[in-house]
Amino acid sequence: MERYTKKNERFKAEEGKGSKKSRTFLTERERRALFNDRFFDLKNLIPNPTKGGEASIVQDGIVYINELQRLVSELKYLVEKKKCGARHNNIEVDNKNTIYGTSKIEHPFSKNKNTFNCLIRTLRFVHHF
C-alpha cells in the first residue's frame, strides 16, 4: 500500500495531465534504466570485475580492451612470422593457413637476405598497430 504524501499526490496529478515535467521524469527514468542495463551487460563481459560501481566497470572495460588489443597484435605478429618462415622454407600454405612440410629453425639475424627482409616487414607490420 502506497503512503500518502504531497509529493505522490503532486506526481499523480502531473502524470494525469501529461505535463512536460512528468514526461521529462519518465524519460530520465528510462534513460537511467538503459544505462544500468548497459553497465550490467559490460560487467558480465569483463572477466573478474573489481567492483560494481559504474566508474570501476568502465575502467575494467578499458583495461580488458587494451589487453585484447595487445593479444591481437601479438597473434598477428606470430601469423606473419609463421608465413615468413613458410615462404623462406618453401613450405606450402593453403587458404586455411594450414602449413604442410617441415621447417627448420634459424637464428633471426642469419645472413640470409630473405629472413632479414621478412623480419623487417614483420616489425613494420607490428609497429603499425
UniProtKB/Swiss-Prot annotation:
**Region annotation (Disordered) ranges:** 1-24
Supply the source organism for this entry.
Answer: Arabidopsis thaliana (Mouse-ear cress)
Compartments (UniProt record): Nucleus
Pinpoint the bHLH domain residues: 19-68
* Family that this chain belongs to: Belongs to the bHLH protein family.
This protein's GO CC annotations = nucleus
The answer to whether UniProt assigns keyword DNA-binding to this entry is yes
Q: Report the protein name in the record.
A: Transcription factor bHLH138
InterPro entries named in the record: bHLH91-like, bHLH_dom, HLH_DNA-bd_sf, MYC1-like_bHLH
Q: Which UniProt keywords apply?
A: DNA-binding, Nucleus, Transcription, Transcription regulation
Q: What residue spans carry the Basic and acidic residues bias annotation?
A: 1-18
- Which CDD domains is this protein grouped with? bHLH_AtMYC1_like
Q: Which GO terms describe its molecular function?
A: DNA binding; DNA-binding transcription factor activity; protein dimerization activity
